Amino acid sequence: MSDTLKRLQKIVSEQLSVDPEKVTSTADFGKQLGADSLDIIELIMTIEYEFNIDIEDHYASKITTVQDALNYIENKIKQK
């Protein structure tokens, strides 16, 4: 498991108040982790801060699973 995934799982678990074991790569933020639209906005903002990246609005709406977020973060880090 990559360090990025571990950090992301910790962030998601804390932000959404869910058991870390439920934060799998295929977990959907809304359907499986119980996030509403405000939770997702706050989660995106926390990810931006913690990973020092910007997530453009048109991409933010496409990030629905932990894997989506991980892919986006890793791509942004590679671009730096």
From Swiss-Prot:
GO terms for molecular function: acyl binding; acyl carrier activity. 4'-phosphopantetheine is transferred from CoA to a specific serine of apo-ACP by AcpS. This modification is essential for activity because fatty acids are bound in thioester linkage to the sulfhydryl of the prosthetic group. Keywords: Chloroplast, Fatty acid biosynthesis, Fatty acid metabolism, Lipid biosynthesis, Lipid metabolism, Phosphopantetheine, Phosphoprotein, Plastid. It holds the Pfam family PP-binding. GO terms for cellular component: chloroplast. Residues 2-77 form the Carrier domain. It comes from the Eukaryota. The keyword Lipid biosynthesis applies. Pathway: Lipid metabolism; fatty acid biosynthesis. Carrier of the growing fatty acid chain in fatty acid biosynthesis. NCBIfam families: acyl_carrier (TIGR00517), PRK00982.1-2 (NF002148), PRK00982.1-4 (NF002150), PRK00982.1-5 (NF002151). This is Acyl carrier protein.
